[in-house]
């Protein structure tokens, strides 16, 4: 077992590379980057950002156990609209591609919210329907 920390634990505006280095400096053996709408780890980015982060992690001796994403708060897999669900499905595919390029063994997918939305404006689904 080892200690790992998520990218969201760091100040907003820090990129994944800076967070990885800060995690190492703080004594963490692992770092969980976040897949986002924009940036080097995003659906639009391709593999280059993931490969660069993997290379940095390897050179620094930091493990990358998984890849998180908060994109499902705005684009839930449990959305009522088929078009909205298709967007979420495309995000899952892109996140899996990024995870493969990073060499991580797991991704975080929050398929939707029930009851009250966690994120402002996120669509909530009845528990029985989720």
Give residue spans per PLM region.
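Short, solvent-exposed polar/charged micro-motifs at secondary-structure junctions
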Residues: 13, 43, 76-77
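Glycine-rich, proline-tolerant flexible connector loops at the mouths of alpha/beta enzymes
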Residues: 32-58, 111-119
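Active-site acidic/histidine proton-transfer and metal-coordination neighborhood
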Residues: 17, 58-60, 76-130
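Acidic (Asp/Glu)-rich catalytic clusters
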Residues: 19-27, 44-67, 93-103
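Aromatic-lined carbohydrate-binding surfaces of glycoside hydrolases
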Residues: 71-74
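Short polar catalytic/cofactor-binding loops
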Residues: 7-14
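A short, structure-level motif marking secondary-structure boundaries and short turns
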Residues: 3-6, 37-40, 79-82, 120
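Hydrophobic faces of well-ordered beta-strands that scaffold small-molecule active sites
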Residues: 2-7, 31-33, 64-69, 107-109
């Amino acid at each position: 077992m080892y200690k790992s920390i998520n990218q969201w634990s760091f100040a907003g505006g820090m990129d994944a590379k800076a967070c990885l280095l800060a995690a190492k400096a703080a004594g963490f053996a692992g770092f969980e980057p976040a897949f986002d709408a924009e940036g080097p780890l995003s659906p639009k980015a391709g593999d280059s950002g993931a490969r660069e982060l993997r290379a940095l992690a390897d050179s620094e001796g930091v493990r990358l156990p998984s890849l998180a994403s908060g994109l499902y708060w705005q684009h839930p897999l449990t959305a009522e609209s088929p078009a909205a669900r298709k967007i979420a499905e495309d995000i899952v595919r892109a996140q899996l591609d990024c995870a493969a390029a990073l060499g991580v063994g797991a991704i975080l997918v929050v398929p939707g919210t029930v009851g009250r939305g966690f994120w402002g404006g996120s669509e909530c689904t009845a528990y029985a329907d989720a």
